[in-house]
Each structure stands twice: as structure tokens, then as C-alpha cells.
Amino acid sequence: MTLSFITRWRDELPETYTALSPTPLNNARLIWHNTELANTLSIPSSLFKNSAGVWGGENLLPGMSPLAQVYSGHQFGVWAGQLGDGRGILLGEQLLADGTTMDWHLKGAGLTPYSRMGDGRAVLRSTIRESLASEAMHYLGIPTTRALSIVTSDSPVYRETVESGAMLMRVAPSHLRFGHFEHFYYRREPEKVRQLADFAIRHYWSHLDDEEDKYRLWFTDVVARTASLIAQWQTVGFAHGVMNTDNMSLLGLTLDYGPFGFLDDYEPGFICNHSDHQGRYSFDNQPAVALWNLQRLAQTLSPFVAVDALNEALDSYQQVLLTHYGQRMRQKLGFMTEQKEDNALLNELFSLMARERSDYTRTFRMLSLTEQHSAASPLRDEFIDRAAFDDWFARYRGRLQQDEITDSERQQLMQSVNPALVLRNWLAQRAIEAAEKGDMTELHRLHEALRNPFSDRDDDYVSRPPDWGKRLEVSCSS
């Protein structure tokens, strides 16, 4: 089957990019590709048999028209000016059989006009982390970009140490960012901001294109998508680590995996980015930061959208967030209905977990085994303060009895939303260290495991992290 690529971005937004081709690596070789995703995108298996090829930027497929996008943004709350694709190149937009499209974006593809002081490269460590994280999030049911392939090489890349240059093929319906809008707003070119909005609506919100107040309706949906995404992050214990406005997806996708981390111990103020000295992007601050970022996006639209309409959309954020979060947390607790004591029970559990540094993922997974008519709980042994746990658990069992559902039905529901497996940093690090020595076995094994996060396991993928794996420091270096 011949793949079809179109050039909407290149044709319709000529002032938002620089056309250029990838710069290949030395002795590049394909070490992993996503068979399931490739099948979904109807990519012939033969494309994965010619070593690096398109996956390493050595050649292009017919119809591809590569370009690097320009955007700007606020980083750690401060205006950073022009940024852009400093090491990534959009190779093309694949047209799928159902009429939708998928960007092919090659990360680590070499210098671009937006590289600033960088070298345009990515390292094996960061490409492995992003591939694992994006696929983990996908199988958790959370909107995200996807990883299609990883290429490593003999090209040295200089970070804190000398590392192997690598490339990641990332795919997504769109790479539209809040930062695209900010770029032209701060250049005082509101007509180009409007062109971006029209492009987004025309291709991704086409049902709104003929509406008289299409910009208000569109921005309201952007707010809702963002709120829903953040709610889902919070329920699985995911910390993004670098929620700059240029890393915010207009479509509500998890974008740009850098110093991310899933909670091990339940620590509300968890900071996964060792460069985040003030804790701006801490786990519990993510909902507030997302709203702040939406406010920055709203500002860019103010030249052609009524401020009252923008504020009305922003005001809806909190309720959408709380609705999605509340629904998912009730499912995680096994509640079939909404009762007034639910929030208090959840907050008391969180207080217990925070005091005892309980493992976030294991706690909710073990809670899924609760039998409402039994005073015993496998979770009890996880707590030092047994009396406090017993008090909470008695009230929790009482709450369960308010819903007309069998234990087996409730347990099945809870196990479908409480994963046994998340991508803990130590698991990723183990795969990275093996890969850096030339052994890709653990990389492939972990990718396969992450496809079934809600299945019971009895291996170390679902155990507490070893001492060396706790609080691994991760930076933005990639």
C-alpha cells in the first residue's frame, strides 16, 4: 500500500516554518518500532527492513515536504520569546483512509534555524523515555502523541556526558501548540493569529466552521480538552515536569515528554524536574498552571474574540476539571453513584497516604480487592498507623454498601481504572542503561508490558521501586 502525504501546513501557513531536510546520523540503525501503531497507520512492514531509512532522516517518502515550525512561549512563567523546532522536523502529514491526518515529526533530526544554542540532536536516553512514556499514556487511555520508531547511531552528542545520537519518529493528529499563537501575538501580527485559529477550526473543528461565533465555541472546547487532560494526569499520578506554553497541545494531547515522572510515594508537591527550583510544575500545581497557560492563549485571541467570551470559556475550566476528576476518582474508589461524603473520604485517604508516603499506584490497585462485607483488607499492611486506616476503611466499606453492585462487578470496574503498571522512572532507567550497552531486550520487554497496564502481574514491574530507583533526578536535557 502506498502512503499518502499532504502539505496543508506548508501550503496554508507559509510564515510559520522554514523548509529544510533532516541531517542523517552516522551509522544510524533502527532499534525499535511500534508494530501495532504501524499497522493502524497502514505502514508497510518493508519500510522497517531497510535499516534507518526514513526513520533516521536518510530519505523521504513520496509526498513528504519537511519543515521546522516556529513558535514562542512562556517558560517557567516568563516570556521566553522565539523558540520553535530546535531539533525536530515535521516530515509530512499522512492522509489516512478515514480522511483524518497524522503528523510525522522526526525528533533529533539536526540543526534548524530555531536551534538557538543547541546542536539539533536528541540522545538515546531521551528518545527511549519519550517512546515509553507516550505509549504508556496511550494504553492508560490518556490523550497523547505516539512513538513510531527509535534510531540510534555512532554519532556522539555532548550533554553532561558524551551520549549516542538518536532519532524518534513521533506522530500526532497535530503539533499545534499554544506557543504558535503566542509567537504572532507578541510580534503584533493578530491577522496571523487569526489565520492559525482558522486553520485549526477548518481542519480539527470543522463542525464549527460555519458557526457565527465559531471562535468562542472553539476556544471553549480547547479549554475543555485541556481541563479533561489535566484531570486524567492527576488521577494516574502523572507529573509532566515542564508545562511551558510551548509544550501545550491545542488538541489536548500530552506533548513533549522531558523530565516527567509518575508518582511513587504519594507526595502532592512532587517535583520531577530538577531544574524546577520553585516547584512551579509540581504535581499538585498542574491544574493551576494549565489554567494560567490557557489565559495566555486567550490573550492572543483577544484582538478578534470578545474578552467576555474568552473569560466565560476560562471560567468553565474549573468545573470541567472537577467533573472529570471527580468521575474518575469515584471509579477508582469503586463508587457507582455520587454521594456527599465522597470528597471527604477521598481527601482523608490522601491525607493518610501523604503522611505515610504510601505508593500511589499500589494503594489504589490493592483497594480494588476490597470486599465490602469483610473488615479485612490487603491494603491494611501497607499502613503503619493501622488505627487510622481501620477508621477510614470502616467508613469506606459503609459507603460501598450504598451502591447496589456486587463485589466482583465493583472490583472489575476498579481494576479497569486503577493500573497495576505505570512507567516508573526506574523502569525506564533500567531499559535505558541496557540499551546504551547495546542490549535492547528490556526496551522491547517493557514496551510490551506497558500495552496492558490494567492486567495483574507478579514481576518487579509492579513492585515498589528499589532504593536506587526512588526520586531519580531528571532534567530537560535531551
Curated annotation (Swiss-Prot):
Catalytic site: 246 (proton acceptor)
Superkingdom of the organism of origin: Bacteria
Cofactor: Mg(2+); Mn(2+)
EC code(s) of this entry: 2.7.7.-, 2.7.7.108
Binding site for Mg(2+): 247, 256
EC class of the enzyme, as a word: transferase
InterPro entries: adnlytase_SelO, SelO
Protein's job: Nucleotidyltransferase involved in the post-translational modification of proteins. It can catalyze the addition of adenosine monophosphate (AMP) or uridine monophosphate (UMP) to a protein, resulting in modifications known as AMPylation and UMPylation.
Family the entry assigns: Belongs to the SELO family.
NCBIfam families: adnlytase_SelO, PRK00029.1
UniProt-recorded name of the protein: Protein nucleotidyltransferase YdiU
